[in-house]
Design a protein with these regions (language model features):
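Short acidic, Gly/Pro-enriched loop/turn segments at secondary-structure junctions
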Residues: 80-86, 102-114, 436-440
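Small-residue helix/turn framework positions
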Residues: 51-63, 95-97, 102, 119, ...
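Terminal hydrophobic membrane-targeting helix
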Residues: 6-96, 235
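Extracytoplasmic assembly/pore-lining segments of large envelope/extracellular complexes
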Residues: 330-332
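Long, internal scaffold/assembly segments composed of regular secondary structure
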Residues: 256-258
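A short, compositionally biased domain-edge/stem linker segment
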Residues: 78, 82-88, 298-307, 412
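Intrinsically disordered, low-complexity segments enriched in small/polar residues
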Residues: 288-307, 454-456
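N-terminal Sec-pathway targeting helices
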Residues: 1-4
């Protein structure tokens, strides 16, 4: 029976030249916004399975600027051909194979990405909920390997696919592996899934990327083990028309970060929460004594801006970390809240304990105009200056409790312009200020004695203990003016004024 069927098929195909249908295939592709050009032959294939082989296909659309396939092979099982009740959900296709494809992917605001050596294999093809084996591989950035494997079940309502269920999903990007499953309800625009990864050595992966992209620079970090053990667990339920939620557990070098995201398309609101017990920030900064890298420091916290960039509505981000450790001090009980959109962001709260005191701040960042602008209102309370100087200079030569605040605004897109535009006022006070390295009263008395020609007598305590030190701050014309400086040493009253030329980096004291 099978021999007769094969003979009939061979007889029929010998009279049908599939190349005659190339213009029709290209026209159908054009109706679906795909520009298709079949440059090679379309031929029948009989072994190991009956099918069609298409050589040299060139294609493009709104996301693929240039694509090509050396060979596309589509096969059908004999039993499938016996069923003459063909429709969109019951096609007689058994397998699809793509050999040596290339594609140049383009996306708004991103650099184009070239994929080479594309290979796709689909076996046991089904649109009625049966399990289909899917695998694909490619190379990016020259020879960086990508691959994906999954068991896919597709369902069809007679007109279009309505459900996709991918199990045993494994995605590999060079040294990075991600496993999980995804279930998509296309009718209700709902995607539910779970993804996880084993330990990833991000540091080693970055080095591999740098070998292929020399323009890519690897950040210099203080710890040799920074970013060598990264993994995550992620669960999500996404509805492109309604409510979505994401729950992530991110582990970075044994530091756990819990990230939850809730987004509602109907209200246009997104809420993001990031919490952690500890973050060893100093591990990811340049080693102490090396040139500082503000861009690297900013890149560490750049992911916090993603909700504002990726979400078109209003976003709220809350960050809570029990302890952030630096090289010489720690920040504890950090809490911050950001609210806004991509072009206007408000820091409604920033609170932290550091250096024996507290930091509080609010701010606004307005990116709606050509020149970005901002306002900033930081407040320091009872900062221990001995701790601060020890942490920043290595010497606890200055002591006292610093409190103060400032309200400042600025505009510009570079440091010089911002410094020139700064406007604001503030004040500060230092309770029980002390300079441990010298005694001002002794110095003044000795100077007076020398001028009068007499000898200085009396004993003086080590260091200088001042009365409460107060002053006012004023930002204008690229200057920080410190006025109304007022303190005393015993009966000796001290007053002063200081000017800091921020652009020229000059300092004067009167």
């Amino acid at each position: 029976m099978l021999a007769l069927i094969m003979a009939a098929i061979v007889g029929i195909t010998s009279f049908v030249d599939p190349n005659d249908y190339a213009p029709d295939i290209e026209a159908v592709a054009g109706d679906n916004q795909l520009i298709l050009d079949i440059q090679g032959d379309i031929s029948w294939q009989f072994f190991p399975q009956l099918g069609i082989s298409v050589k040299r296909i060139v294609f493009s659309n709104n996301v693929i600027s240039a694509g090509s396939i050396d060979e596309l092979v589509i096969t059908a099982g004999l039993l499938n051909l016996l069923n003459t009740d063909f429709d969109q959900a019951n096609l007689p296709i058994d397998s699809i194979k793509v050999v040596n494809g290339r594609a140049r992917y383009i996306a708004p605001n991103l650099l184009p990405v070239q994929f080479d050596n594309i290979a796709i294999s689909i076996n046991n093809f089904s649109l009625d909920g049966g399990e289909t084996d899917f695998s694909a591989s490619a190379a990016v950035f020259g020879d960086l390997p990508l691959s994906i494997e999954a068991t896919v079940a597709l369902s069809h309502d007679g007109q279009k696919p309505n459900r996709v269920n991918a199990t045993n999903l494994q995605l590999n990007v060079d040294q990075i592996s991600i496993n999980g499953h995804i279930n998509a309800d296309l009718e209700n625009a709902q995607i539910v899934g779970k993804l996880s990864s084993p330990s990833i050595n991000i540091r080693r992966q970055l080095k591999a990327i740098q070998l292929k992209l020399p323009i890519f620079s690897i950040p210099v970090m203080a710890s040799a083990t920074a970013l060598t053990d990264v993994h995550f667990n992620s669960e999500f339920s996404i509805n492109s028309k309604g409510y979505s939620n994401y729950t992530h557990q991110l582990f970075i070098d044994n530091q756990k970060f819990d990230v939850t995201v809730e987004a509602d398309q109907t209200t246009g609101l997104m809420n993001t929460s990031v919490t952690s017990n500890q973050f060893r920030l100093h591990d990811y900064l340049p080693p102490q004594g090396s040139p500082s890298n503000n861009m690297q420091t900013g890149a560490i916290f750049a992911p916090l801006a993603l909700p504002f960039v990726m979400w078109s509505g209003e976003s709220q981000i809350e960050l809570s970390v029990n302890e952030i450790t630096m090289q010489t001090f720690s920040v504890r009980n950090l809490y911050s809240r950001l609210v806004g959109r991509a072009n206007f962001i408000q820091l409604t709260s920033l609170n932290a304990d550091l250096l024996g005191g507290q930091l509080n701040a609010t701010a606004e960042f307005d990116l709606r105009d050509k020149q970005p602008s901002f306002t900033l209102q930081p407040q320091l309370n009872t900062i221990d200056l001995s701790q601060a100087f020890l942490a920043l200079t290595g010497n606890p030569d200055v002591g006292g409790e610093l409190s103060g605040g400032v309200a400042v605004s600025g505009i510009g897109d570079n440091l010089v312009t911002i410094q020139q535009s700064l406007l604001g006022i503030g004040q500060f006070s230092v309770i029980n200020p002390i300079f441990s390295t010298f005694n001002v009263e002794q110095t003044v008395c000795q100077s007076a004695a020398m001028l009068s020609g007499s000898n200085s007598s009396g004993s003086f305590a080590a260091g200088t203990q001042l009365d409460t030190l107060e002053g006012n701050l004023n930002f204008a014309d690229g200057q920080l003016i410190i006025s109304g400086i007022n303190t005393a040493i015993g009966n000796l009253k001290l007053r002063g004024r200081s000017t800091v030329q921020m652009i020229e980096q000059r300092y004067t004291l009167n």
